[in-house]
Regions:
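Anionic-ligand binding patches
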Residues: 2-6, 10-31, 35-209
Length: 209
């Protein structure tokens, strides 16, 4: 029987992307919906790290299985690091990706390229179901990845999700391709989530996944 690992999300995009990034052939990856987990954790942390911890602990306690949680978002220099932990709800609790993108573009309207710097941030947290951290008592393990770039003038590309259509990764010229125009393979080579996943993978391997 393959070991079971919960990916503490209801986002089909995050579940698919983390599955592709972690490539845990020996493990069965399950979402909260796969396991019929009701309710949602209260994401009231002030940082990505805090919210990743909250979500990982919620999932591990609810399922009695090891759980990996992702908390991620975008930090814009001109907004003093905003939207930050409010990334998903930037334009409101029920906002779509398009709503959030439009609000961010509006907030930066008129700013020159040099002032549109931003970075994607991802924190992954691993929690075990009995309150222990990995390796029998150490604190919950977290891994962090970032991807530097800038906010485009307008959306381009239908790939990815979130703010990908308005995020030009570092290395692209102004007006160059956004993450929404990258293939999945290209995105996985540089994205914040990919970098965090590469750092978390040895930890998961160590624990039999």
């Amino acid at each position: 029987m393959r070991p079971r690992l919960v990916i503490a999300t209801r986002s089909v995009h995050k579940l698919r992307e983390l599955g592709e990034l972690l490539r845990l052939e020996r493990a069965e990856l399950l979402s909260l919906d796969d396991l019929g987990v009701p309710g949602e954790p209260v994401e009231d942390g002030a940082t990505f790290q805090a919210n990743a911890r909250i979500k990982a602990r919620f999932a591990a306690d609810a399922t009695n299985l090891p759980s990996v949680a992702d908390d991620s978002g975008i930090e814009v220099d001109a907004l003093d690091g905003g939207p930050g932990v409010w990334t998903r709800r930037y334009a409101g609790p029920q906002a779509t990706d398009e709503d959030n993108n439009a609000k961010l573009l509006g907030a930066l309207r008129g700013l020159p390229v040099a002032e549109r710097g931003a970075r994607y941030v991802c924190v992954l947290a691993l929690a075990l179901p009995d309150g222990r951290g990995p390796r029998g008592g150490l604190p919950m393990i977290l891994r962090r990845g970032t991807c530097r770039g800038r906010i485009a003038i307008e959306p381009r590309g239908a790939g990815g999700f979130g703010y990908d259509p308005i995020f030009e990764p570092a290395g692209e010229p102004p007006g160059g391709r956004t993450l929404g125009e990258y293939s999945a393979e290209e995105k996985h080579a540089i994205s914040h989530r990919a970098r965090a996943a590469r750092l978390m993978l040895p930890v998961l391997r160590e624990h039999g996944f």
